[in-house]
Amino acid sequence: AKKEAEKAEKLRAAGVQPQKKKAVGSKFFNDLAGLMGDEFMKRGATLHGCDVRTRDAFANMDIAGYNYGIYRYKHDLKKYPNRLILGSETFCNDAYRFREQAKKNPRLVGDFVWAGMDYLGEVGVGSWEYKAYATQFSGLGWTTAGSGRIDLNGRPLGEALYTRVALEQEIGPYIAVRPVMFSGEKHSPSAWKMTDAMPSWSWAGCEGKKAHIEVYARAAKVALLLNGKKVAEKQLKNDCLAKFTIPYQSGTLEAVSYDAIDRVLGRCKLQTAGADTVLRAVPEEKKTKPGRLCYIRIRYTDRAGELKPMERGMVNITVSGGKLLAAGSACPFHPGSYLTPETDTYYGEALAVVEAGES
């Protein structure tokens, strides 16, 4: 692998584009799903051959694991009355549907959304990336899948909030906003990405642009307020997600969720960051011991600590009293190294991993 990487780097330095290999096996189907959408995978799982190939094996298993089998659950639970089913790999946008089915049938024992956290490999399969962060939508430079509900640096995204509400760990509401500065721009295709929304209302310079807002709530309806004024309201049916599009205006964005008789169930607010910008180093733990790993978030914020996702810059990291082991952003397109002290930021943030020293 090292020799292949060195060869590819030499070709790139010489301006030679490597030959694109034909996708086969899992990569072929992943690429096809990226182009055709998640229905391709879910409809494929309902083909008769899938049942024929698995029924004998499942008859000898304690639990049958289904990949993208949301459309098979109801049928198979009836056809195989002794079968326990686990969603071993599923799409994020099916989490609500799974939960509603599982409440009606306890033989649906669990669901694993792919993927909980981003990871190295299967590069770009779950990424919605824009040209500002990815100079090309395929080829060299991609390092992670981009399909995590939690990004590579450990930051929960809008999809993580949606999943928590869908699986009834919380009732919400939560607000997440798609990057307003990229509104209307094309992004890399993926079936494994439900949304690129994040919990932020800090989009400086985007006044008047379309803001695509998502509210996640277990409720009968949700209302959206901007700077104290109600600007939209939606009923929630067959999902815990309401989508709104309004012109961006800085200030306070609030979501209020209601039950069927208009009682308030919850509130959530996002506040625009102030005009001042500060680069902060924020350790996850205030105290540590020699030899322990310290994860330090490097963030562009205002003076109150509110993240500013539109701020971007190259950061050079120096460490005293410890050893820098790695540094990088969560961007799936990362043509550089995680082993150097210099890193770009991604939506206002990067991460440094430091081994604590004796002092």
What are these regions (language model features)?
Residues 2-291, 303-307:
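Substrate-binding clefts and catalytic carboxylate motifs of secreted carbohydrate-active enzymes
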Residues 216, 353-355:
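Short hydrophobic/aromatic beta-strand micro-patches
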Residues 221-229, 312-325:
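Extended low-complexity, serine/threonine- and proline-enriched intrinsically disordered segments
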Residues 236-242, 334-351:
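Aromatic sugar-binding surface patches on proteins
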Residues 245-251, 346, 355-359:
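Surface-exposed, short loops/turns at beta-strand junctions within beta-sandwich domains
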Residues 276-280, 317-333:
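Short aromatic-acidic-glycine turn motif
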Residues 286, 351-352:
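Non-catalytic helical/linker scaffolds that mediate oligomerization, partner binding
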Residues 287-321:
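Conserved, compact domain cores that house catalytic/ligand-binding motifs in diverse enzymes
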